[in-house]
Amino acid sequence: MSEITKLEPKLVWELFDAITRVPRPSKKEEKIREFLVDFAKKHNIDYQTDQTGNVVMRVPGTKGYENRPCVILQSHMDMVCEKNSDTAFDFDKDPIRTKIVDGWVKAEGTTLGADDGIGMAAALAALLDPALEHGPLEALFTVDEETGLTGAFGLGKGMLTGRYLAVSYTHLRAHETSAHLV
């Protein structure tokens, strides 16, 4: 575990730290998909995958919110994979090394993968957080956003039941290597 696991909200940063340890280049999302499926199984969360490789997880609404409309939390599994010329790093097998520098979460010599690792972490945290009151939630994790939106365009019919979509986004620009802590 890296020092980012001490940040708040703790669950989000712990999940992001775990996600940074899983290789997830575009078109090679098998390991992160396995991570997501294992996560769903471990936490008894209903899940489904489609032929494209997308994953959807579903949790019911909390007490008093069961009949509210379902909200879809969307994020993507893959990341931009770039490294400094002097960095020995294999995006197919190496974990991202994170650190905090002057209030910023950064990666050591590579892109951070906050786009959209932090979106995945936030969605997973929302599914688990017992203090969060919510209607039914669906968390959609799509493949290959960075190089073609393959997962979004190939989403299996009937995968989603929600009527409202909360699209995950970050304030990072493409290829940026850090995220500021607010």
What spans do the regions from the language model cover?
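Conserved small/polar residues in nucleotide/adenosyl-binding loops
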Residues: T170-T177
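Short beta->alpha connector loops
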Residues: G53, E145-T147, L172
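Phosphate/pyrophosphate-binding betaalpha-module
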Residues: V167
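Conserved strand-to-helix beginnings and helix N-cap segments that scaffold or border functional pockets
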Residues: E30, A152-F153, T177
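Charged catalytic carboxylate motif
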Residues: L11, A122, T170
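Active-site metal-coordination/substrate-binding segment of hydrolases
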Residues: Y65-P136, F141, E146, F153-G158, ...
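Acidic/His- and Gly-rich active-site-bordering loop/insert found
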Residues: E3-G103
